[in-house]
């Protein structure tokens, strides 16, 4: 089972995303093993999908929610409930604002026994604080 971070989820949905081909390749090979979203990644997906400064083909909130519903209908999906607080003792040490979401997702993945799939090398580095947190860092082939 793999939890896709926001960037991986956005890349999966939008063919204009720079990493779309890579995540589709990964998804084709891995989706049947199970893939997941959580409240944080779903909210991030809607936020990014509706922001024209981030996504040139941005859509409205209702449309972004419909796309999310369609993604969740793809086989192997599981929604992970989220009970992480950033003040919990098992959250990696956060030293900068760009690590807040990463630390949250890493903690959720570890608690649920899933790996976190990301394109962000910084997440991989942060995960080294907790060696039992599996992270799959996708690279462009």
Curated annotation (Swiss-Prot):
Predominant cellular place of this UniProt entry's protein: secreted
Residues holding Mg(2+): 5, 102
Known cofactor(s): Mg(2+)
Any one Gene Ontology BP term: negative regulation of growth
Molecular function terms, GO-annotated: magnesium ion binding; RNA nuclease activity
UniProt-listed InterPro entries: Mtu_PIN, PIN-like_dom_sf, PIN_dom, VapC_family
UniProt cross-references to NCBIfam families, sorted A to Z: Mtu_PIN_fam
Family (UniProt): Belongs to the PINc/VapC protein family.
Protein name: Ribonuclease VapC38
Organism: Mycobacterium tuberculosis (strain ATCC 25618 / H37Rv)
Chain's gene name: vapC38
């Amino acid at each position: 089972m793999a939890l896709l971070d926001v960037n991986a989820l956005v890349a999966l949905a939008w063919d204009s995303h720079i990493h779309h081909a890579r995540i589709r390749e990964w998804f084709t090979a891995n989706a049947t093993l199970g893939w997941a979203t959580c409240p944080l990644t779903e909210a991030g997906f809607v936020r990014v999908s509706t922001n024209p400064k981030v996504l040139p083909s941005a859509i409205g909130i209702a449309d972004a929610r419909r796309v999310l519903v369609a993604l969740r209908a793809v086989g192997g999906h599981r929604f992970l409930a989220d009970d992480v607080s950033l003040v919990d003792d098992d959250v990696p040490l956060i030293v900068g604002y760009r690590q807040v979401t990463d630390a949250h997702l890493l903690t959720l993945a570890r608690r649920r026994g899933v790996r976190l799939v990301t394109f962000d090398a910084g997440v991989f580095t942060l995960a080294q604080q907790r060696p039992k947190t599996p992270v799959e860092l996708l690279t462009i082939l």
